[in-house]
């Protein structure tokens, strides 16, 4: 083998290695998700924001995942978890998601869905999502005592009920290897920032949705 041929071979090998390295660093191959699916109710829809498609927490969180991320928002106002199993799970699986958020609990609690039934539905939902290998974030029930619609409910009774639900959500989430987004722990901020609520005293305002998106983003960045 001549020295000239050896030099050419080394050049080809070197260019190949460099090309592979550059390809591995390109945005197309980076470890950012490309499909984000949101399962939820009116909060996922963005009720309370004048421009839900922009100001809701779902589009804001989706934007934080990277410019190439496609957001599939399956939220339906008024949805319970059982309804989401029938209406949202199928499209979620069809989307082949990289990231999934689930915030479905408050409507169930308000509708007095038996906690055992809710637990079974959450177990079924997360079990169905597991084979996607998506990163799954599940939000719990916030501190409802801070919200005007619950003003007539004894605070200690409501807090105890929320704690029961959150324990089930935390246990089920952990059992399926999903990550808990602890909205309850952050809800004192609502009392400190009344501007986080819309005029109905229940749904977030644009500022509230921005903070919600930040909590999801922080949890995701922490390894969620």
Task: For the regions a language model picked out, list residue spans one by one.
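Conserved donor sugar-nucleotide recognition element shared by glycan-biosynthetic enzymes
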Residues: 54, 81, 162-165
């Amino acid at each position: 083998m001549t020295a000239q041929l050896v030099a050419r071979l080394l050049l080809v090998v070197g260019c190949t290695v460099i090309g592979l390295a550059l390809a591995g660093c390109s945005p197309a191959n980076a470890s950012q998700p490309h499909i984000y699916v949101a399962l939820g109710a009116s909060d996922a829809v963005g009720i309370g924001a004048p421009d839900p498609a922009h100001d809701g927490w779902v589009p804001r969180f989706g934007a934080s995942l990277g410019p190439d991320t496609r957001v599939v928002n399956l939220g339906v106002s008024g949805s319970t978890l059982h309804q989401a199993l029938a209406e949202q799970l199928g499209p979620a699986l069809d989307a082949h998601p990289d990231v999934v958020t689930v915030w479905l609990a408050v409507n169930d609690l308000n509708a007095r869905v038996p906690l055992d039934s809710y637990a079974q539905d959450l177990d079924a939902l997360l079990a169905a999502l597991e084979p996607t290998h998506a990163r799954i974030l599940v939000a719990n029930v916030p501190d409802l005592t801070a919200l005007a619609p619950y003003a007539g409910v004894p605070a200690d009774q409501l807090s105890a009920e929320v704690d029961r639900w959150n324990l089930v959500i935390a246990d089920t989430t952990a059992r399926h290897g999903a990550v808990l987004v602890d909205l309850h722990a952050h809800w004192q901020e609502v009392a400190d920032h009344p501007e986080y609520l819309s005029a109905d005293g229940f749904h977030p305002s644009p500022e509230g949705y921005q903070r919600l998106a930040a909590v999801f983003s922080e949890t995701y960045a922490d390894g969620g």
